[in-house]
A protein has these predicted regions:
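Active-site rim helix/loop that mediates acceptor-substrate recognition in acyltransferases
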Residues: 1-41, 150-175
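Conserved beta-strand in the GNAT
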Residues: 19, 26-37, 50, 55, ...
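A short, polar/charged loop-to-alpha-helix boundary motif
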Residues: 38-45, 111, 196-203
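Conserved acetyl-CoA-binding loop-helix of GNAT-fold acetyltransferases
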Residues: 51-56, 61-78, 211-223
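Conserved GNAT acetyl-CoA-binding A-motif
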Residues: 70, 75-89, 227-238
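Conserved active-site alpha-helix within GNAT-family acetyltransferase domains
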Residues: 78-83, 89-107, 239-252
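Flexible glycine-/small-residue-enriched beta->alpha junction loops
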Residues: 102-119
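Intrinsically disordered, low-complexity, positively biased terminal segments
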Residues: 120-252
Length: 252
């Protein structure tokens, strides 16, 4: 049954929490959350139901509770105009039973900082220190980035707490935004310095850029860490044409 069986509030206003109950004892067996998002797809924005909170009490696993939640929720998703649903599966085979399929792949780029030879940048870099000073620039970059890739979630203002609460000195996470000489935002990166088996590295949790100039600006920033760091690592969508962004691939 829905979280409130007497009020099927449209998903656009509230998350929807579904639960399955044991018919004899009335005990809650399983839960599924469906949260409202907007995603980019082929130039348009569409409603997407994000699946989360999938859980069953151990004694009720494999008892059909999750299946029952999906059987009730999916028709309402259709009725409310949802085009997509998205989740991180604990089992690909299990969720294929409900029509889910793998749709997102990405690269993990690992670049040797000593090999970076970016052109000198005529722009500037700004370090986030909390507050919303960089919020307009980073939101602009996110909107451009999201428009390039299918299934990218359109970020709301509430999604930027990581930026508003930036504290590089205490958290040791560094968020830099790159700007052109004219003051246009080119890219940004959020990273930590981590000791790993292959060296002391810059490990990015977020990296966005606009065009070749944006990528070059971030590489210019990273190259300044080459004296005491070995690699920079960052995730990218698999369709990003890395071979055109890096001028030299040979390390011979």
């Amino acid at each position: 049954s829905p979280f409130d069986p007497n009020d099927l509030t449209p998903f656009a206003e509230n998350p929807c929490i579904w639960a399955a109950f044991d018919e004899e004892s009335g005990e809650m067996m399983s839960t599924v959350y469906v949260t409202d998002y907007r995603v980019q797809f082929d130039g348009g924005r569409y409603k997407m139901g994000g699946i989360g909170g999938v859980a069953s009490l151990p004694q009720y696993r494999r008892a059909g509770g999750i299946r029952a939640c999906f059987q009730k929720a999916v028709p309402i998703l259709y009725r409310e105009g949802y085009v997509f649903s998205y989740l991180y599966p604990f089992s690909t085979a299990y969720y294929r039973k409900f029509g889910y399929e793998s749709c997102v792949q990405r690269y993990l780029a690992v670049l040797d900082l000593r090999q970076l030879r970016p052109a000198e940048s005529s722009g500037s870099f700004r370090l986030a220190r909390g507050g919303d000073m960089l919020l307009p620039a980073i939101r602009q970059l996110d909107e451009r980035w999201e428009a390039q890739y299918n299934m990218m979630v359109q970020h709301a203002e509430a999604d930027y707490r990581w930026l508003l609460s930036a504290a590089p000195a205490s958290k040791q996470e560094f968020i830099y935004a790159a700007f052109s000489a004219a003051g246009e935002p080119l890219g940004y990166a959020a990273f930590k310095k981590q000791d790993e088996p292959d060296g002391r590295n810059l490990v990015c949790s977020r990296l966005r850029f606009f065009g070749k100039d944006g990528f070059a600006a971030l590489m210019h920033l990273f190259s300044r860490f080459a004296s005491d760091h070995r690699f920079v690592k960052f995730p990218l969508p698999c369709c990003t044409a890395m071979q055109y962004l890096l001028p030299e691939w040979s390390l011979g």
